[in-house]
Amino acid sequence: MSLLLAQAAVNDANIHFDKLYSYRIPAELAGRVFPGSMVLVPFGRGSKARMAVVLAVGEVDESDAPKGLKTLYDAAPEDARLTPDLLELVRFLKERTFCTWFEAVKAVIPYGAQYRPAVVDGRHVMQSRLTRSTERLYTLAGALPEKPKPGPRQLAAVAALQNGPLTARQLDEVGISRATLDGLVKKGVLTAAEQDKAIDLFAAIPFDPQPLELSPEQQQAFNDLLPNLEDARPHAALLHGVTGSGKTIVFLRLIQRTLELGRRALVLVPEISLTPQMIRRLKSTFGSRLAVQHSALNNTERLLQWRMIQQGNADIVVGTRSAVFAPLQNLGLIIMDEEQEHTYQSESAPRFDAHDVAKKRAVMENALLLFASATPLTETYHAAESGKLQLVQLTHRYGGRPLPSVDFIDMRAELAAGNPREVSVRLARELQENLDNGEQSILLLNRRGYRTIGMCTTCGHVLKCPNCSVPLVYHKPQQALLSHHCGHTVHPLPQTCPECGGKISYSGFGTQRVEEELAELLPGARILRMDQDSTSRKDAHETMLAQFARHEYDILLGTQMVAKGLDFEKVTLVGVLGIDSLLFGQGFRAYESVFSLITQVVGRGGRAALPGRALIQTSVPDHPVLQLAAAQDYKGFYREEITFRRFSLYPPFCSFVVVGFIGDQEGAVFIAAQRFGALLGQHAAQKPNIPLRILGPAPMNITMLNNKFRYKLTLKCRNDAAFRALLHETLDAYDAEKLPQKASVILDFNSDGDL
């Protein structure tokens, strides 16, 4: 006699128990359990109910069945099953990031689509984490009987449904009650079914398609990309265009052609702040078969959008990093806009890079993957130069508009002249000029808060978070010190030193402080501050950007969320403040990040008929990175950067992997990192064909976070299957070590040098 078995990965299993377990499928579940099914299983001592995902199903002779075989408790409905494509992405994440099976599962499906264990009438069952919001859909199924004579409401209902199914809500709006409809169902005139309640997130955006008129250069870019879009094989390309060159209209034309081919499109953006403008362009051009996926949606909205995609009711999906897992079928085009942004990398398990997942999906779907940026990653441009990606260029601004002129303001001279403010005299003057002319300005300061450091004037003690090794930041509206890493709050604001009783002086500046200065310097100016603090409310990004577009504000002051992708025709002045701290930041990408940030924000100016200009405040105006960014000279920067990367052995000439160690005792964490490094070296010595350099152990940039000490090993390697197998061997050997205190191990395969 044969048994039907499921191989399942169990939720909440730690890394040592994260493997596939065999379970018997009972007869009552035989037709409901398949690869990708979410199931409820007994696990461990006491057979505690746990969620699991099925990876494989097969038959085995009863005599060959594993001893102690347990039986599945329950299985989720079919619509909760992971498609084969999503299941393949789960396997990909598990293999590439060393996460657990269920960490990968939770990455590819939204919270609302997940289930939890419950007990009903003494039985272990699965319950949805969200109450499903449904509505009744009525469909015409037959003719009205002549007798008894139908009433006017019944006739109206049948007439309304002649053109297709309608919901109870839609019919109620024209005066047809639920009682009338249910009466017609009983007569067999209508059929009724429950469907997910529709939420039109874009109802306020009209469908107003305009001709997609391309410039000759844009048309050439489209023509160059078209053969790979129409080819039924996977392809990848880089669209490198200067700021304002009109990359978006090329996107729209490619999406239009994708839909004509009967396929679907996925558009990724790095920031939630960029989704409103992209959604507006897509909805107005292509209509309502559009879905969105990002973290600003509540759980219900995200689930309904996900189900809309899953059920094939969306042709285009736009969203941030997590949208790369959208369950689109027949995917023909993936666009990754502003592909250089670090936000495409996840900072929690599974620590994936959306670039890698997008490449995997393009191969799985035989799709075109298009990276796009004015300042692409050095690795991406190198791949294009090397012929691994198709390189398509847009070298001119749309409409022949010039790039903004750029000047530097030497803040050393400002200080010497007696200006104590963070806003220079010239920047204030030019902001006033814009106000007088009815034009708008954007100011970038990538530092939130009011004051960034509190220090004792007597002993020099710096006020730091007790849970983290970072200074606390003064936030004036709350009159409190906040940790931007763990959220620790100190209130009321300390005025005396906890070490010696001396006076605390607050210095440094953030967006709140500059907002206050601008109000003092420019009375009557309407200033909109856009940072993590001011955009915490739902729909805040969309609301603020719409207000600025309507010229309800004169100055947009913000962090990096205002630096890229935004297009406002009245913005003619861009100011950059506080860039020096980023220029001398840690990590091998510091120069690349600064070049990109300045190039992008400068490109926000002069995008319509009015010419643009930019002012960069710095104490190092002659720095070559700033000079190249001011000139919008990406190729010049790339030549310098690729030379540095080659000489120093940084990506793309190697992979850069960080192994992090986290624990309660600093000494124990250091010893754990040291021992892991020794074990890795020993195993690597037996495999001389695997290139590897081990650096460290060393403290991470933030040595303590959430009361945990943090050390790291940095590995320069070739991240292939052989290297990952070596890491697995080392992890197994480390787990077998008898250390007095072990540290948690975290791996990041996409690091710039820290976690």
Language model features: what each stretch is:
Residues 14, 522-525, 680-693, 737-742:
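Short secondary-structure junctions
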Residues 678, 682-705, 709, 745-755:
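A carboxyl-terminal module marker
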